[in-house]
């Protein structure tokens, strides 16, 4: 704005030879520093990026019961997907509902997740081979365990500083883990 105002003043009080140059600058379209979304390389990526270096705190599972999980002091009801600094609801009912699409959130992140710990409820269940194949093709290891052991494994890997995710289904029935000072109602 200040530059344009300076050119206007210069244009009005110009000598004849400077006029053509200033006139051409004044009337030519200029985009300046503004970029359209197509010009910006970061706009063209198709991945989501949730990890940030400014927030180095990790996600830890405090407790779980048949209704859900307590993660960093916050209650999450039902199945959930844990990312290095984020928790999201996971829309699966049982291990049989787990598909490639339900795991897609784990391979969209950057930096890439090294390992995904899957908790399948009270006992360890097998996943479809296509799901495991898709994760292997993307370079992500999958560890399938019952939910109590998956919670412990996830906390251990986070404590080690590994870039890990978890896909957890709450164990049915009365199986529960409460951290000190919490009840398992």
UniProtKB/Swiss-Prot annotation:
Interacts with NDUFAF4, NDUFS2 and NDUFS3. The lineage of its organism: Eukaryota, Metazoa, Chordata, Craniata, Vertebrata. Keywords: Membrane, Mitochondrion, Mitochondrion inner membrane, Nucleus. Expressed in testis. One of its GO terms (biological process) is mitochondrial respiratory chain complex I assembly. One of its GO terms (cellular component) is mitochondrial inner membrane. It comes from the Eukaryota. Pfam families: DUF498. It is found in: Mitochondrion inner membrane; Nucleus. Belongs to the NDUFAF3 family. The keyword Transit peptide does not apply. Essential factor for the assembly of mitochondrial NADH:ubiquinone oxidoreductase complex (complex I). The keyword rRNA-binding does not apply. InterPro entries: MTH938-like_sf, NDUF3, NDUFAF3/AAMDC. This is NADH dehydrogenase [ubiquinone] 1 alpha subcomplex assembly factor 3.
